Amino acid sequence: MSMDHLVRIIEKKYEKKEIPDFRPGDTVRVHVKVIEGDRERTQVFEGIVIAKRGSGINRTFTVRRIGSHGVGVERIFPFHSPVVEKIEVVRKGKVRRAKLYYLRDVKGKIRIKERRD
């Protein structure tokens, strides 16, 4: 048995099964488990998916939202992290790029057409 095969077997154990299908341009709501001292709570981060990268257990996606005072906030979430409790797709967006890094430079309200599947 090769080392690569062993790594895949171990990774399979930690993969999450209930990940919804979403693409860059979609608006998602990510429920993140936050531990502060001895308290544990769920924090919701909602924004536009601007990138997906990696493969297997190392897959990540980047979500961008406009926070308070018009400051853009980006967070990178691993797909299979135990910290990510749930991912909801709020709205499906229609874009022509796999990486939407150009949204970092856009001022004002960002318009992404809605995809109808």
Swiss-Prot record:
A biological process (GO) annotation for this entry?
translation
Please give the coiled-coil regions recorded for this protein. none
Q: Does the keyword Ribonucleoprotein apply?
A: yes
Q: Which InterPro entries match?
A: Ribosomal_bL19 (IPR001857), Ribosomal_bL19_CS (IPR018257), Ribosomal_bL19_sf (IPR038657), Translation_prot_SH3-like_sf (IPR008991)
Gene3D superfamilies noted in UniProt: 2.30.30.790
List GO molecular-function terms, semicolon-separated. structural constituent of ribosome
Q: Name one GO cellular component term.
A: cytosolic large ribosomal subunit
UniProt-listed Pfam families: Ribosomal_L19 (PF01245)
Question: Looking at the keywords, is Ribosomal protein present?
Answer: yes
Q: Which PANTHER family is this protein grouped with?
A: LARGE RIBOSOMAL SUBUNIT PROTEIN BL19M, RIBOSOMAL PROTEIN L19
Family, per the entry?
A: Belongs to the bacterial ribosomal protein bL19 family.
What NCBIfam families is this protein classified in?
A: rplS_bact
Q: What is this protein called?
A: Large ribosomal subunit protein bL19
Originating organism: Thermotoga neapolitana (strain ATCC 49049 / DSM 4359 / NBRC 107923 / NS-E)
